[in-house]
Amino acid sequence: MSFQPGNLPAVGTGALPPQITRNWLYQKACKIRGLFALPFRKQKTPFFCRFSFLYPSVQRRILPTSGKENKMKKRNIRKTAAALTALALCAGVLTGCGGAASSTASSVAASSATSSEASSADADELAAQNVADLIDAIYVQQRTDDTDAQCEAAKAAWDALTDAQKELVEGENADPDYFGRDTGDASKDDARNADEIGENELLVVSFGTSFNDSRATDIKGIEDALQAAYPDWSVRRAFTAQIIINHVQARDGEKIDNMQQALDRAVANGVKNLIVQPTHLMHGAEYDEMNEMLDQYRDKFESVAVAEPLLGEVGADATVINADKEAVAKAVTAAAVKESGYESAAAAAADKTAFVFMGHGTSHTAKVSYSQMQTTMQTLGYDNVFIGTVEGEPEETACENVIEAVKAAGYTKVILRPLMVVAGDHANNDMAGSDDDSWLSQFTASGAFDSIDCQIAGLGEIEDIQNLYVAHTKAAIDSLNG
């Protein structure tokens, strides 16, 4: 039926109240249809977000996401069905023109009820959109004077939503998982942002993660090991990803210093000797940017030293390996073998099982570190260990290339595990997620393997890795003593 005024049936004499004209009915139908119309929303970029000038190289999404497109499709279906119902009710009113007044009154009542439901649905959308806007406002890579208040406002607005309204939260970067996804107990973590530092500070600088359990076991695990090893130094924390700092603060009320805040705190507390221990994997872009920020504060301390990242010096090409990379290769392989139930990597190989360790990847010249890790694995005799990266840089570490390499080697079982300090978003989503582009899904879709299992564990929880950071810190402290 075409909803145009000229196509509506004539109003029967005395059958409807005089105000129920063809134009009135048409306007009501359009109003109901408009209330249910789904406004176009720009689809957010799946893996990237905008960041400030402070850390321009940080390009990956950090926040947990899962099944968002399916949720939007379901909402579209519900709204389409509701709109069709509303229009059908209006059609019922129209076809009743000229009939009994009681029948018309019932139709008008039904239309009014539907309009009321539409208004309620519209109110839900507005409430959800308000929260989405508040989340988008703090989903940034820089801190402002308004950040604390914005974090509180976003959480308060989220808490005020009903469960149904929470499912409707969609913004440029916002989704229900921002506040709604359970990533563990934040109280197990320690922000390490207290004053009364003393003269000696050991500042542990990490990218960060919004996954509470991983933050406590991986990052805090390293910090605790360093504090135990060096009781005369006060261990403090700094994250370089403001997007994560804001997320944790808004959702859990935990305030973590960014690099600038941590250095300002050190200066205000009269710190004289500063050791900076990055938990970064390599001498990459984040390591460089950390040093650029530190350079602005070096003259405010009597002595400053920066410890090596986990993998140590980069080296000239893929054939150059060092003791740090060898130690990491042994530690992560041993942990993976133990968790999988094998006695050794060789025993796993005999059972046609391959281990795939997924790193982040980078366009920085330090990307050769991943190739060096593959060389290290081969040198150690771990022929069933393969190194890959989310970003696919270096090229041979891209998922499709790793799949082909594992297939060509004849392995029929695969165990995926992150080659990352923290088992956060990348491990849970990019590696083990249910989306088609996750590594688990891609390995499964290849049809080449009998089984694919995932181990969600960061390097930071491995004791031998913690000890390697302790050794790097010792070298930095020794450098201050000449």
What are these regions (language model features)?
Residues K42-K71:
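Short, Lys/Arg-enriched N-terminal segments with co-localized hydrophobic residues
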Residues K71-L84:
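Bacterial Sec-dependent N-terminal signal peptides
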Residues G92-G96:
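C-terminal motif of bacterial Sec signal peptides marking the signal peptidase cleavage site
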Residues G98-A100:
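Bacterial signal peptide processing site
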Residues S102-A121:
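Intrinsically disordered, low-complexity serine/threonine-rich repeat tracts
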Residues A121-T183:
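Beta-rich interaction/scaffold domains
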Residues A123-E125, N173-I415, M420-G482:
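Extended amphipathic ligand-handling, pore-lining, and cofactor/metal-binding catalytic surfaces
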